[in-house]
Amino acid sequence: MTNAGADGERRTPLTVSMGARRASGSFSGRANGHLPTVEEVSAGGVVITPASKGFDVAIIARYNRGGRLEWCLPKGHPEGNETYQEAAVREVEEETGIAGSILTDLGSIEYWFTVPTHRVHKTVHHFLLEAVGGELTIEKDPDHEAVDVAWVNLDELDRILSFPNERRIVQTAQQVIQDSL
């Protein structure tokens, strides 16, 4: 199954995996006329706050390269020697304005997409975070990728999030929350 990613590129979602690895950033060779492959990694998460009905989650909206608005979980690349957890906390705060504290690992998703010069195999590590401060804003996003941010009830995310693989991460978060109550 192929869909367009937040950056407008075609992506093929793979299964949710619990493996952890850093992207090498290296290219596989251009054998038999195939595009070289670059490994990328990101981290982000499901940041929750108590709401009148269960929990709300901070999500962001971005325009893909085709100009379509897509709602997704906040995420981004680790910087320097950041761990996935540190990158997730930083990216969530940059893209949503909400400071979060990690509660648990929710697993990883993998997908492929192609840009004109290469194919990208991307792994995104997700964490469940508790909101501990801040206010919703996109003003802290240094890349200005997010065009909107919103608190959405956890039970409504399945119909709002643009990507099936992120909806599966939210289902994992729902199960973790249910198991802890």
Task: Report residues per predicted region.
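N-terminal acidic, proline/glycine-rich, low-complexity intrinsically disordered segments
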Residues: 1-15
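A short, polar/proline- and glycine-enriched secondary-structure boundary/capping micro-motif
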Residues: 68-72, 147-150, 171
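N-terminal strand-loop-strand
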Residues: 16-73
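Unchanged
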Residues: 78-168
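Charged phosphate-binding loop/patch that engages nucleotide di/tri-phosphates or the phosphate backbone
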Residues: 17, 159, 164-181
